[in-house]
Amino acid sequence: MKKINMKGMRKLSITATAMVAAAVMALAGCGSSSSSSSSSSGSDSTSGAKTTKFVLGGLWPETGSLAYLAPPELAAEKLAVKDINDAGGVLGNKITTVDADTSDADHADQNTSAAQSVLSKNPSFIIGPASSSVVKNTYKSITSQNIPMLSMGATSAGFSGLSDYFFRTVAPDTVQGAVMGNLIAQDGVQKLAIAVFNDEYGTGLRDTIVKTASAAGVDIIYGEKDTFDPTETNFSSIATAIKASNPDATLVIAFDQTKPLLKALASAGVNTKKLYFVDGNTSDYSSELDAGLLEGSKGTIPGINPSDDFVKRLESTGVDLKNTTTYGAETYDGIILAALAAQKGGSADGKTIQANMAAVSGSTKGEKCDSYKACVALLKDGKEIQYKGQTSIGAFNDAHDPSSASIGVYKYDADNKPVFDHSQEGSVPKA
């Protein structure tokens, strides 16, 4: 899951609904599949045949536990399409879109039916899903057809080099985990307890944090191997066990389980001013918890905060962002990169886009440009480019991860809202 960037980056307050945010990185499930499209027929060609028609496929969590993530992603899609088409489109044609609702990973049938709905329109490229678990349920059906896909939020470390046709604009959990582990150690924590749900995202991130923190001298006194079921609703026994372990601080890795878990920790007498959260739950709890309960606690979220100007542009699309911009920048940049790849390669087919994604991201160390319009102008002059958009990620490496990315560190205020403190850039390990 990624990141929970909020409107007003310098006094960021992430909404409670965004609490399940990095669910984006791992959940996927309920609801019935649906799709909508501004292109009823899609591209006339297969993923390998040359074409000038760019059909953008989108897989979004419009229903289910991740539904709060859809608005900023859909707004970013609308904005990117507008910017591309206003600049002349791709290869002289306006791009069209076909979208489908994947819901979340609890209902794999909808994940796959949404993917098939989009694939039936012969897309040139697919943006999404954001969740690692939903990606796991869908990527083979997409990449096997030589259609490139890009996830804006799937942070699973195991996805590095997943497929020649899989890309992402967010760093793998190895980066966030290392930053969090070092943050815990730098804060002087000597005894750490961990509450983590039994989920690929949760345990993978936990293991990286444990490795980094332990190497820095932190003793993991609870939760190094323990997990709880994602469907758990009663956390009293876990909270009691954590209290009994007498930790200096507690790391919580969960999605929508976080609220009841926090209440249980508080009831058990655990120090809630010394908690650490990750992108799945670094959220606004101002309306859920007593004022000051989390003051001083910290969280990490992959990526940078979007600029105020970019947030305003997202709002200008008419989509109600629900006070969150989670994965908006990653979605926008992913679409722009794909359009530039088609423009550079001279065709909007999947193979051409895949072959040029790394180059337009900067792997050939071309001239820097920060907008689709500016980059296209350079391409038309025969120049190599390096698109530097909203996320400021490094060029795609051989595993199709960004070669470098930022992790934001947030600190909770007296209203139980996470406020952006600083960002730390990290290099992405090679697969």
For the regions a language model picked out, list residue spans one by one.
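Extracytosolic ligand-binding ectodomains
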Residues: 2-431
